[in-house]
Amino acid sequence: MKKKVAILFGGQSTEHEVSRVSAASVLRNIDTSKYDLFPIGITKKGEWFEYTGSADKIENGEWEKDEFYKSPNGQAILFNKEVDVVFPVMHGLYGEDGTIQGLCKLVGVPCVGPSVLSSSVCMDKVYTKYVLEHFNIKQADYVVVHAHEYKTSKEEIIKEIENKLGYAVFIKPSNSGSSVGITKAHNRKELEAGLEEAMKYDRKILVEEALNAREIEVAVLGNEEPKAAIPGEIVPAKEFYDYEAKYENAASKLLIPANLSNENLEKIKNIAIEVYKALDCSGMSRVDFLVDKDTTEMYLNEVNTIPGFTSISMYPKLWAAAGKDYSKLIDELIELAASRNNA
């Protein structure tokens, strides 16, 4: 008997469009001889719809206007437990932060990817740092800025950043993905502008020292005994791998494997698995590192619990390089969700 799988996409986060592209890619690659599919789209207004039309219309956003294939029973499918597994392809807030995971837990339907707690901690860059400090995972130096404190103590906070980190620094909303709202500052003027920009997306901001580093990504898969694929390297077309470089600039390159020694490839895989376990991840995550260009010292950058699944995304590409094609990867993720739920 075929498993019934709900593919959730869209949502109210700033990564709505990326989610649509990822979902379309999953729908094109999933083995329909094994699964009955229930694509469920969530609009930017928070409306839920089942959509049975083409993946192309999901990708380009036309699905919302396609009344023939759209029905308003998206929530009912989940709440009535009409599916066996939920595969959330929703990046960022409300999809990757434990919200959808908690909803699935509440209604008793297995969900692909990490648990509520793991998802919420990994989504919050500041709390990820707090947890991994306990496990002695090397990370870039940082300062946390709260919006309400910045309004009343701006000068003191700016001086703290300058004294502790110097320039250049990266300014990041704590709860945001796909590099949305991230800027790089080389001086005080750019720092102030970057903080204002980041506060459009979150009230808690992470300011990190800008390392002279390469960006290395490791795909991890599994529950109690996770495995890591061969690491890949991002060569951004711009100064850093921002939203435009990730999704709109074809000049950015993905190198598989990363240009590291065999010893360091194994080392970074082992650290990625250590991070995965420390954060109690399950199902999947992409663990991102910064590797110093001079010393090859490895610094944890962030953990993505629902990594991109587009045709150009690193997570499926890394597993394909390891011999696990896209369709088989989806199969394994669904099985991991079901087995964790039955454990």
Curated annotation (Swiss-Prot):
<dbReference type="InterPro" id="IPR011095">
    <property type="entry name" value="Dala_Dala_lig_C"/>
</dbReference>
<keyword id="KW-0133">Cell shape</keyword>
<dbReference type="Pfam" id="PF07478">
    <property type="entry name" value="Dala_Dala_lig_C"/>
</dbReference>
<keyword id="KW-0067">ATP-binding</keyword>
<keyword id="KW-0479">Metal-binding</keyword>
<dbReference type="GO" id="GO:0009252">
    <property type="term" value="P:peptidoglycan biosynthetic process"/>
</dbReference>
<keyword id="KW-0961">Cell wall biogenesis/degradation</keyword>
<keyword id="KW-0963">Cytoplasm</keyword>
<dbReference type="GO" id="GO:0071555">
    <property type="term" value="P:cell wall organization"/>
</dbReference>
<dbReference type="InterPro" id="IPR000291">
    <property type="entry name" value="D-Ala_lig_Van_CS"/>
</dbReference>
<dbReference type="InterPro" id="IPR011127">
    <property type="entry name" value="Dala_Dala_lig_N"/>
</dbReference>
<comment type="pathway">
    <text>Cell wall biogenesis; peptidoglycan biosynthesis.</text>
</comment>
<feature type="domain" description="ATP-grasp">
    <location>
        <begin position="129"/>
        <end position="335"/>
    </location>
</feature>
<dbReference type="GO" id="GO:0046872">
    <property type="term" value="F:metal ion binding"/>
</dbReference>
<dbReference type="InterPro" id="IPR016185">
    <property type="entry name" value="PreATP-grasp_dom_sf"/>
</dbReference>
<dbReference type="GO" id="GO:0005524">
    <property type="term" value="F:ATP binding"/>
</dbReference>
<feature type="binding site">
    <location>
        <begin position="162"/>
        <end position="217"/>
    </location>
    <ligand>
        <name>ATP</name>
    </ligand>
</feature>
<protein>
    <recommendedName>
        <fullName>D-alanine--D-alanine ligase</fullName>
        <ecNumber>6.3.2.4</ecNumber>
    </recommendedName>
</protein>
<dbReference type="InterPro" id="IPR005905">
    <property type="entry name" value="D_ala_D_ala"/>
</dbReference>
<keyword id="KW-0547">Nucleotide-binding</keyword>
<feature type="binding site">
    <location>
        <position position="302"/>
    </location>
    <ligand>
        <name>Mg(2+) 2</name>
    </ligand>
</feature>
<comment type="function">
    <text>Cell wall formation.</text>
</comment>
<keyword id="KW-0573">Peptidoglycan synthesis</keyword>
<keyword id="KW-0460">Magnesium</keyword>
<keyword id="KW-0436">Ligase</keyword>
<feature type="binding site">
    <location>
        <position position="302"/>
    </location>
    <ligand>
        <name>Mg(2+) 1</name>
    </ligand>
</feature>
<dbReference type="GO" id="GO:0008716">
    <property type="term" value="F:D-alanine-D-alanine ligase activity"/>
</dbReference>
<feature type="binding site">
    <location>
        <position position="304"/>
    </location>
    <ligand>
        <name>Mg(2+) 2</name>
    </ligand>
</feature>
<dbReference type="InterPro" id="IPR011761">
    <property type="entry name" value="ATP-grasp"/>
</dbReference>
<feature type="binding site">
    <location>
        <position position="288"/>
    </location>
    <ligand>
        <name>Mg(2+) 1</name>
    </ligand>
</feature>
<dbReference type="InterPro" id="IPR013815">
    <property type="entry name" value="ATP_grasp_subdomain_1"/>
</dbReference>
<keyword id="KW-0464">Manganese</keyword>
<dbReference type="GO" id="GO:0005829">
    <property type="term" value="C:cytosol"/>
</dbReference>
<dbReference type="Pfam" id="PF01820">
    <property type="entry name" value="Dala_Dala_lig_N"/>
</dbReference>
<dbReference type="GO" id="GO:0008360">
    <property type="term" value="P:regulation of cell shape"/>
</dbReference>
<comment type="similarity">
    <text>Belongs to the D-alanine--D-alanine ligase family.</text>
</comment>
